[in-house]
């Protein structure tokens, strides 16, 4: 076992720097080449023991800087919309809407990595993670202490985002798989404008 651990470490150290840098370089290339994105997503949440506690599907759209929309469709409906100034989280079943200023909602959140400005290193410490799945992985650790999560991992094929993983302090892992991805589509501004439903219970600023 000790020999295997040492051998693994030696192999890791022998990987060329250009290969080990792929994750962060792919993240930076994504920022440069992708100003808008539309995709279907499948999201699975596991607990600290690896048990699946949630699985949902939906569609997402983003347009930098600061505009995004996540529509959860299965097994329940929920909407998260960022219009560049505020973030709106709506639960139709409860008819409840939570509103937060964009600066407080995504400064050091996973959303800021995708829809925020290109200077991710201002809010995150970026490193490359090596995995055997054929993707280039970048790890982003928030510099703010109150971000609500420990790290985000983003898996790329070239400069195209394929997967995301969110790890929180309780050991929960949220894995997001993207498919039917469109890069730089024309997205109407109305997609990021949230209209408050009649009678909704509004919470927040």
Curated annotation (Swiss-Prot):
Q: Which Gene3D superfamilies match?
A: Lipoprotein localisation LolA/LolB/LppX
- May I ask which residue range the UniProt record assigns to the signal sequence? 1-21
Against InterPro entries, the record matches this protein to:
LolA/LolB/LppX, OM_lipoprot_carrier_LolA-like, OM_lipoprot_carrier_LolA_Pbac
Keywords annotated in UniProt: Chaperone, Periplasm, Protein transport, Signal, Transport
Where can this protein be found?
Answer: Periplasm
One CC-aspect GO term: periplasmic space
What lineage is on file? Bacteria, Pseudomonadati, Pseudomonadota, Betaproteobacteria, Nitrosomonadales
The reply to whether Protein transport figures as a keyword in the UniProt entry is yes
Its main localization is: periplasm
Q: Which gene encodes it?
A: lolA
**Protein name (Swiss-Prot/TrEMBL):** Outer-membrane lipoprotein carrier protein
> One GO biological process from the UniProt record?
lipoprotein transport
Report the protein's function. Participates in the translocation of lipoproteins from the inner membrane to the outer membrane. Only forms a complex with a lipoprotein if the residue after the N-terminal Cys is not an aspartate (The Asp acts as a targeting signal to indicate that the lipoprotein should stay in the inner membrane).
Subunit structure of this chain's protein: Monomer.
């Amino acid at each position: 076992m000790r020999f295997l651990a040492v051998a693994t470490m030696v192999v890791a150290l022998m990987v060329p720097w250009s290969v080990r840098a792929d994750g962060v370089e792919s993240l930076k290339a994504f920022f440069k080449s992708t100003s808008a994105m539309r995709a279907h997503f499948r999201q699975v949440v596991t607990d600290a023991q690896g048990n699946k506690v949630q699985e949902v599907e939906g569609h997402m759209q983003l347009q930098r800087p600061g505009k995004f929309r996540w529509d959860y469709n299965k097994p329940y409906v929920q909407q998260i919309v960022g219009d560049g100034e505020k973030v709106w989280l709506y639960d139709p079943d409860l008819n409840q809407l939570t509103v937060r200023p964009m600066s407080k909602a995504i400064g050091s959140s996973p959303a800021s990595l995708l829809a925020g400005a290109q200077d991710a290193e201002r809010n995150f410490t970026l490193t490359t993670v090596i995995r055997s799945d054929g993707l280039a992985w970048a790890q982003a650790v928030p510099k703010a202490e109150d971000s609500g999560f420990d790290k985000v991992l983003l898996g790329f094929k070239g400069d195209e985002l394929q997967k995301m993983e969110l790890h929180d302090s309780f050991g929960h892992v949220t894995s997001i798989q993207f498919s039917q991805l469109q890069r730089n589509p024309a997205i109407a501004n109305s997609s990021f404008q949230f209209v408050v439903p009649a009678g909704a219970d509004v919470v927040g600023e």
